[in-house]
Amino acid sequence: MKMIISLTFLGILMLAFAEVNSETCTLMEAAKNFDENKYFNIPLAYATHSKNREPETNVCREYSTARGPDGKTVTTFTIKDKTLTSAVKCTNTPIPGSNGQFSSDCELSAGNRITVTTSILATDNEKYAILQRCPTSGPGNILVLQTNKNGVEQGVQNYFNQKGWDISTWLSRTTVGC
């Protein structure tokens, strides 16, 4: 009887652990108006809001993009934390048949590499973008990128209203103090 109770308890623990660690990120549909040539010509964008609160440095990032010699776009984002500044360089490869979605091979400042998939959920291809990032495991995140680090572009607010999201509940540059 003790053995049955022990095995049942162990099974429940394993199931609970599996459910906690099975959270995955699924890319949402990209913006229909996404224009790669215009979008990747945005000179500098600031992460102004982050859906997830960890890590807080998500909203202390500055994004710049250039074309590499092979024609691929390379995005560099600088993390400006209160105590540390570091850069991450990502080479973006379009996902075939999915305009506005990319697989990004990123080199961290310590030399490590990670791969994330991204989807441009909404953009005007000039002043703002709402970017979803999905790592190979875990929940991922959604970031608001804007050329103006203060305020919220009307297009961002319109998208949030359409989705039923409240931007005031998201982490912002103001609340973190970048």
Curated annotation (Swiss-Prot):
Cystine pairs: 25-134, 60-178, 90-106
Keywords, in A-Z order: Disulfide bond, Hemostasis impairing toxin, Platelet aggregation inhibiting toxin, Secreted, Signal, Toxin
One Pfam short name: Triabin
Aminoacyl-tRNA synthetase found in the keyword field: no
One GO MF term: toxin activity
SUPFAM superfamilies reported in the protein's UniProt record: Lipocalins
Superkingdom of source: Eukaryota
Signal peptide: 1-18
One of the GO biological process terms: symbiont-mediated perturbation of host defenses
InterPro entries in UniProt: Calycin, Triabi/Procalin
Transmembrane segments: none
Tissues/organs with expression: Expressed in salivary glands.
UniProt-annotated location(s): Secreted
Any Gene Ontology CC annotation: extracellular region
Primary role: Inhibits platelet aggregation and vasoconstriction through binding to distinct eicosanoids involved in inflammation (acts as a scavenger), and has a role in inhibiting host innate immunity by impairing platelet-assisted formation of neutrophil extracellular traps (NETs). Inhibits platelet aggregation by collagen, and low doses of thromboxane A2 mimetic (TXA2 mimetic), and arachidonic acid (AA) without affecting aggregation induced by ADP, convulxin (GP6 agonist), and PMA. Binds to TXA2, TXB2, prostaglandine H2 mimetic (PGH2 mimetic), PGJ2, and PGF2alpha.
Family to which the UniProt record says this protein belongs: Belongs to the calycin superfamily. Triabin family.
UniProt name for this protein: Platelet inhibitor triplatin-2
